Regions:
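Acidic (Asp/Glu-rich) sequence patches and key acidic residues
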Residues: 1-118
């Protein structure tokens, strides 16, 4: 059983059911924390539709929080969500510019995770 993330009928990430559910839940929680829409909408196929511009703004907000916090716990909590979101955003043909001190590491981790995400 899977949890697909789709854009215009194209599957961007055919996540495993539990991985997809957890990611969507974490994104909802982070969006609420950031006071931004996540750009992910549950669909009838048991996954989520991605609205690229809203999702891009969410990822940008998440990255802004991640790159500016000095709180190691908050930084750690946001890390996996951000890397996964960067992969999904790239697949949705959206992008943000990473210019902070974590940029190179995040881009390397994004490339590794993208392969694992299929």
């Amino acid at each position: 059983m899977s949890y697909p993330f789709e854009l215009g009928g194209e599957t961007l990430w055919d996540a495993g059911y539990h991985s997809g559910q957890l990611y969507a839940s974490l994104a909802r929680g982070a969006a609420e924390f950031l006071e931004l829409p996540s750009g992910l909408t549950p669909n009838d196929q048991g996954g989520c539709d991605v609205e690229t511009e809203l999702f891009r703004a969410f990822v940008e907000g998440l990255d802004g929080m991640y790159s500016s916090t000095k709180n190691q716990v908050l930084h750690g909590l946001a890390h996996g969500l951000l890397v996964t979101s960067l992969v999904l955003l790239e697949r949705a043909e959206g992008e943000i510019t990473l210019t902070h001190r974590y940029a190179a590491t995040l881009l390397e981790e994004k490339a590794v995770l993208a392969r694992a995400m299929g």
